Amino acid sequence: MENKKPLVLISNDDGYHANGIKTLVNFLKDWCDLLVVAPESARSGFACAFSATTPLRLKRRHNMGNDVEVWSCSGTPVDCVKLALDQFLADRKPDLIIGGINHGDNSSVNNHYSGTMGVAKEGCMQHIPSIAFSSCNYDENADLTPLRDGVLKVVKMVLEKGLPEYTCLNVNFPALPPFKGFKGCRMTHGSWINEVDHRTHPHGYDYYWMVGEYRNDEPEATDTDQWAVNHGYIAITPTRIDVTDYDWLKNFEL
């Protein structure tokens, strides 16, 4: 019998227990077949890293929403996607892969650091339409239910229309509703400064925290993801796996 519901693989970088991933499952569980494979603990900032030198563990967890199967993985978000496709979904390819909902902004250059985006990029490289959802609200207990309508609209659009090959979506919600609507926009040119907090332990050795402040390098631009979320819009940034600078290539001589 043909499967009537779309199959969606869900992962994140905040861990299988995170509020954001549970909220996403609640949004989708009534009309999608879902599988959750997510890190056993927070893996923020792991981007597209995978475990090349250590073995991985999978552990079955309590179901979400009564019948949504949940597994935790000892590795990175990308490991979760790779293992899920190989161990659980070899006979039925997902219609969609989703990373999120992330607790924190993944616009601008955060796109490159984000494990949530790592999920979407890995899905994209596996030729599966993929989306990353993030909220600019960093509170791990934040009420994310206001994101429901926006998430469902994007998911349904991608399931119906698909995405270009090697393109995934980076979707960022403002910290607080109401949301003014959607903006298709480009990635903001930004950077991190003052990133290292150097401290001295009471036992005498030095140690360091990676902290930092985000700097918008084009604050006047109005076509960027940062502008959109700062002005109450849901930012949708199509992200290509191919990062070649074709303009530079046109003029290359050596």
For the regions a language model picked out, list residue spans one by one.
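A cross-family phosphate/adenosyl-ligand binding-site feature
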Residues: 2-4, 8, 19-87
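Electrostatically charged, flexible surface regions
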Residues: 144-254
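Structural motif
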Residues: 7, 95-96
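Glycine/threonine-rich flexible loop motifs
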Residues: 105-114
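Glycine-rich phosphate-binding loop signature in dinucleotide/nucleotide-binding domains
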Residues: 88-94
